[in-house]
A protein has these predicted regions:
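PLP-dependent amino-acid enzyme catalytic core
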Residues: 1-306
């Protein structure tokens, strides 16, 4: 099965930039759909599912990488999946979200909540009713944040990565950040790039980390989750043209922009050898291009090559 073998991703050099050696860890190549940190997060979840829990319930937005990966893994493992979707307005327009359409085709049952109800997660009345209807359901938090998901993310780094000074990762729930913080060497620093402006990262990850030796760069959210600018899209297209590495517009694109911008402005202070973790999420490119097209803006041209 998908998760039954140990996998190391390749490290691809981006060359030297103003004296800094930059390498990207191609976690996006682990699997076509369950790529990057989604592979790591779900590995032990699916391996440890009890036989009497044939249903897995989880949460996500209309363009959630986590929902898409969970739906694919469920289909491969023969596990019925339920997706609790943020925003009841999506109930009658699934076809407008490539992500939700994919989840539906892979057998995931979708339920839509108002944003107020969604904020309550498993405590929402609608979710409680589902759990009563299916009492043996396995509940997976949004983004997969859990002890065994962090355990999977602790397998990202290997002995070859000990030469680097800084390990960079984009942040959603903080699960991948936690896995990296738990495995870096004393001379290394984890630099996190949040996808949104919020101050709760430490609160989210504290139960899962062995130390708090990480730093956050919060200047590269580009206005918030799933928001982009023409400058960011142009950077991502140029990056692909130069390196033939696709980036996603929600997480890795913003992180790479930030790293190069900090180096350019001589504000990078975390050593000369930089390892960037590519967390996948490329399924989010198609819906972003749809959004950009509707606004008459430039798109990520490399989507046709994925």
């Amino acid at each position: 099965m998908i998760f039954n073998t140990f996998k190391n991703s390749i490290n691809q050099s981006l060359g030297k930039h103003q004296g800094h050696t930059i390498v990207i860890k191609r976690e996006d190549q682990l699997h076509p759909i369950i790529s990057g940190n989604k592979f790591r997060k779900l590995k032990y979840v699916f391996q440890s599912l009890p036989k009497n829990a044939p249903i897995l319930l989880t949460f996500g937005g209309a363009f959630s990488n986590h929902l898409a990966a969970t739906a694919e893994a469920g289909a491969k493992y023969g596990v019925q999946t339920i997706g609790i979707v943020r925003g009841e307005e999506w109930q009658n327009k699934i076809e407008e979200s490539e992500t939700l359409s994919f989840c539906h085709k892979r057998g995931m049952k979708l339920f839509f909540l108002s944003r107020a109800s969604y904020s309550e997660k498993e405590n929402a009345t609608e979710v409680q009713n589902l759990l009563k209807q299916f009492p043996n359901t396995y509940l997976l938090p949004e983004g997969g944040l859990s002890t065994i998901a962090v355990q999977g993310c602790e397998e990202i780094l290997n002995n070859e990565d000990e030469e680097f000074d800084a390990i960079c990762v984009s942040i959603g729930t903080g699960c991948t950040l936690a896995g990296l913080v738990n495995t870096v060497k004393p001379h290394q620093k984890v630099i996190g790039f949040p996808a949104i402006q919020y101050n709760s990262i430490a609160t989210l990850v504290n139960p899962f980390i062995k130390n708090s030796d990480f730093e956050l760069q919060t200047d590269y959210t580009f206005g918030g989750y799933a928001k982009v600018t023409t400058e960011l899209i142009d950077f991502m297209n140029q990056f692909y043209q130069q390196y033939r590495i696709p980036l996603d517009p929600v997480y890795t694109g913003k992180m790479l922009f930030g790293i190069f911008d900090l180096i350019k402005k001589k504000k990078w202070v975390w050593g000369k050898k930089i390892l960037i973790v590519h967390t996948g999420g490329l399924q989010g490119i198609a819906p972003m291009n749809r959004k950009l097209s509707n606004k008459g803006l430039s798109q990520l041209y490399y989507s046709k090559y994925l």
